[in-house]
Each structure stands twice: as structure tokens, then as C-alpha cells.
Amino acid sequence: MGEALNGLKRTMMCGEPREEHVGQKITLMGWVQRNRKLGGLDFIDLRDKTGIMQVVFGEEINSEAFEKAKSVRPEYCIAVTGEVVKRESVNENMPTGFVELKCESLKILSESETPPIYIKENLDAAENIRLKYRYLDLRRPDMHRIFEIRSKTTKSIRDYLEKNDFLDVETPMLTKSTPEGARDYLVPSRNYRGMFYALPQSPQIFKQLLMVSGFDKYYQIVKCFRDEDLRANRQPEFTQVDMELSFVEQDDIMALNEGLIAHVFKEVAGVDVKLPIKRMTFKDAMEKYGSDKPDLRFGMEITNITEDVKDMDFVVFKSAIEAGGSVRALCLKGGATLGRKPLDKLGEFVKTYKAKGLAWIQLKEDGVKSSIAKFLTDDVTNSIIETMGAETGDAILIVADKESVVFQSLGALRLELAKQFELIKDKNEFNFTWITEFPLFEYSEEEERYTACHHPFTAPMEEDLEFLESAPGKVRSKAYDLVLNGEELGGGSIRIHDMELQQRMFKALGFTEEQAWERFGFLLQAFKFGPPPHGGLAFGLDRMIMFLAGTENIKDVIAFPKNQNAYCYLSEAPNIADEKQLTELGIGILPKQEKQEQE
């Protein structure tokens, strides 16, 4: 049984003692990192979140403590009191390595079984074990550092926004399901049998209602939930830095958030963000980088060579051009040395992005080599080389198809080449850009209708309003994303604040007037009472912390994350609900086979 503190107070953290504390009597508390014997003495490395301190036990120092220390094992939680003395053998690798504590009193506060993971930095352990014993994983110093960064970041964000007159307002967690986008997490109501709340995917409608309420500037650091198929760096519940402002335009919101980013990155990471952050339209981003979140830490832009090859007698190029597609290419510097096997692998790679294949031209010292050599004339080859700005030693990698496939496949290939050939020279670089003028709609082949690229409340650009009903695919939006090193850090838009325009938007999305009022009636009703022009933005806090902490795994920055299947190894959630609870809610569970037949 563990001993009680009985009034004993910790006077210093384990990582704090230095030479100036020699001669002082202190009390430390923490966990045993390791213990060892040497020359009739026992040594314990005592650890807390600040670091490690060596504690020495000896018969001549204190016989009772010396005897007690013999039973101590790794991860025992203990308290030690004694005098700080200079170490005979200095350890310059530790901040506390010039001193040690001569233990005069030892309390074993609690014992520990042999831990399933070793508490150390850069732990190499299976993810399911780390998540099951997350409380042990979180004892590691590198994990503590991440959560100190997270805490410092949220404080920095709050300081900046409140200095700019933002008000922190909480919005409901139990809200209405408005199916549009990702699936909702549903919560059954006991009081309203057969009815459900939804956990919010974002506070979108409520923050707009706060603008109608005259709050002017709102922010919230808030949990959001999406029941979607998880990718590597997605979680079913995530944290968002959410904000909304009244009487603003796009430039106002972007300028404010540039200031926020500069403030946070300087205060938390000592990084100077160059302002103003550059801007790029969605169209330019797709045409140059094949992505609406381009990584600008390296070059290799996509180049359109359709004009150069339009007269070639090569059916792949010809059919793509005739179908309204294009032929585009990347120039890989030094790519002429690639053999047939790696080139074939790149061809297989682009096929995973629906491309039909990859044509290539290599500019070798002894001439041109190409997978489509028999279709190339000297004039066409020279024209392609000139357009691409290619030189001897380079390779030109070509895809022909409809533009969505060309952009997607070459965009992915560009990133793959950057990885293979280590084109990103400075891994610590933070390269920001704004992407603007997103399409307002995208066409869903599955649903056979247009869906909102962002959400149904995004304002269209005035000059494109004439196409809202006749050609929705042409309409650009007042939406903007902030991209960092090829990842979306945040996004937002100017909102529709006119009820008539909002109803037109719903109609363009295929909603009847009745459906629009059923789903969003509380917003439309509010729009009858003088809504101000407004807009906002939301940052993914978890992703921001990943950048600031230098980790590529989102699970590292969340205290108790789920795995890729939205399962919690620690608490074993989700679990089977009690039959009594289900009866109270009026819920019955279909057998698995019956459920599949229903589907």
C-alpha cells in the first residue's frame, strides 16, 4: 500500500536543481526512471515532466531510506528529501548532471507493475500498445513537450483574438442534423422518442446567428465531430479555432488571420512569418501544382504542352485533346539517369490516380530517348523542350486526359518525386499561401447533382451570379484556404447574408423550398431580421500543433486519440449499450445479417 504525503510538500521539480542549489535541502517527487547499484550505494534516476535528477542512497547517508530503496522498481512513484551535492562524475548530457540528491527520507507513494512500454523519448512501440496504455505513453518527455506547445498555442491564440475584441462564446454540442457533407454523429433523445440530436461538424450556423445577434466578433476553440472514413491524419473528433466577424470583406479576414498566424508562430516557435502571405487562385494552383493545397517548398510546376503536341499522330494525346482535355507535363531535373524500371513504377503510380499512363522524354548527353519516340518529330520534341525549359540531363513526364485526371495525377506525382529525390531542402521551412476563388459547386457523379464545395452558406462572387442557375460549375466563391507546406491549415469564406440569395443557393443544390426550410429554417428565419454582411474562418488546431511540434502524426498532438477505425484502445469505446438504456431510448439493434439485407 502506498504511503500518504502527510503534509510533505514538493519544493522543487526534478529538472530544476543546479550547482547554485548545492547545500540546500529539497523534496522531489516523481517516477523512477531506472535504478542501479555501484560501490555500496544505490542510485535512482527520478523523473517528472521537467527532467531527471539523480538520487543517491547509502547506509551512511540514511540507513532507513537506503534499505527502503532496495524495493523500488521502475515507474514506482516516490518522494525523496535530502541535500543537493556536487556529483563526483559529471553528466554533461543532463541539465541536472552536475548535482545529485543525497536521500535522507524516502516515501513510496505507489508501486508499479512492469510497464508494457519503456518511458523514453523516440519510443519505437506498436501504436495499439501506445494507445492502450496512453497514460504511460504520455509520461514520455517528448509527449509532454508537445502538450506544452499545445497549451502555449491556445493561450497565444486567445491573447491575440481577445486583444482584437473577439468574444469567446460557446455554441451547442447537441444540435440538429443537417445532412450535407460528412455523416453526422447522432445522439438519440430520451424525451423525444425516435428523434436525434447531432454532434456538430462545425459551429457554422450558430456562429452566423451570433452575427445576426450583433456580437460582431466571435471566436471559440471547439470540439467538432465527423463520422467519416478516416485517413492517416484525421480523427472523428477534432479541435477547431473558429471565428466569425461582421461588416467585413475577404481582405479584412485574411489580414487579421495573417496577424494571428504571425503572432502564434513567433511566440510559440520563434518563427518569423513573412507578411503579407502570398495568394493564389484555385485555378492557378490546380494548373501549376495539380492541387488546391500546393506545397511550395520546391518548384517543379506543371506545364501545359497541349499546343506543342496537338498535331502529333499519337492516339492518347489526340483523343484527350479532342475530348476537351489537355496534355501536361513535369520536368524532373536530373531525371535522364532514371532507368526503365523506375520510370515504369512512376507510370504505375499515376494510374492509381486514374491516369491511363505516363509518357516520358529523357534528354541524355547522346540524344533524346522517349517512350513515344516513334510519334515524335524533331520539331515537336524541340517545341516541348523549349516550353518545358528542359536541359540536357532532365526528364519530361507527360500525362494526357481530362483535366481533372491530369491535375490529380501530376499533382500527386510531383509530391512523390519530391519525396523520392529529396527536393525539399529545408525541412524546417514554413511556406504559407492563401488559395482563393474556389468553385462554389462541384458535381457529384454519385448523387447526380451539384454539391457545395465548402458549405451551402458560402457567398458567390458577384460577377458570377448570372451563372448560379444556368451554369453552376462556372460560379466562383468568396472562399479562401490557408495552406502550409501542402496541408490545409484553415479555411473560411464570406457568407451569404441575403435570404433570397440563400434560397437561390439551396435551389441550385437541388433542395426544394420545403426541404430548405425543414433543414435550415432557423437560419432563414433569422435572415428576415437584418443580418449584417459577415464572414469567418476556422483553423484546425490539431494540424497547427503538428507543425509547431514537428510531428507528422495527428495522434501525437491529441491526449487520448482514436485509431484509424475510430476505436479507442484505452477505454474500448465504442461499446455495446445496456439493454435498459436502449429500451428507454426506443432503440433496437438489427442483427448484422439483417442489417446487410436492409442495405
From Swiss-Prot:
Pfam families hit by this protein: GAD (PF02938), tRNA-synt_2 (PF00152), tRNA_anti-codon (PF01336)
Binding site for L-aspartate: E180, R226, H454, R495
UniProt organism field: Clostridium botulinum (strain Eklund 17B / Type B)
Residues annotated as binding ATP: R226, D227, E228, Q235, E488, G540, L541, D542, R543
Enzyme Commission code: 6.1.1.12
UniProt-listed NCBIfam families: aspS_bact, PRK00476.1
Chain intervals for the UniProt region annotation (Aspartate): 204-207
GO CC aspect terms: cytoplasm
Complex formation: Homodimer.
Cellular compartments annotated: Cytoplasm
A GO BP annotation: aspartyl-tRNA aminoacylation
Protein name as it appears in the record: Aspartate--tRNA ligase
GO MF annotation, one: ATP binding
PROSITE patterns named among the record's database cross-references: AA_TRNA_LIGASE_II
Family label: Belongs to the class-II aminoacyl-tRNA synthetase family. Type 1 subfamily.
UniProt KW keywords: Aminoacyl-tRNA synthetase, ATP-binding, Cytoplasm, Ligase, Nucleotide-binding, Protein biosynthesis
Entry keyword Cytoplasm: yes
Domain of life: Bacteria
Function: Catalyzes the attachment of L-aspartate to tRNA(Asp) in a two-step reaction: L-aspartate is first activated by ATP to form Asp-AMP and then transferred to the acceptor end of tRNA(Asp).
Catalytic activity: tRNA(Asp) + L-aspartate + ATP = L-aspartyl-tRNA(Asp) + AMP + diphosphate
InterPro entries from the UniProt entry: Aa-tRNA-synt_II (IPR004364), aa-tRNA-synth_II (IPR006195), aa-tRNA-synth_II/BPL/LPL (IPR045864), Asp-tRNA-ligase_1 (IPR004524), Asp-tRNA-ligase_1_N (IPR047089), Asp/Asn-tRNA-synth_IIb (IPR002312), AspRS_core (IPR047090), GAD-like_sf (IPR004115)
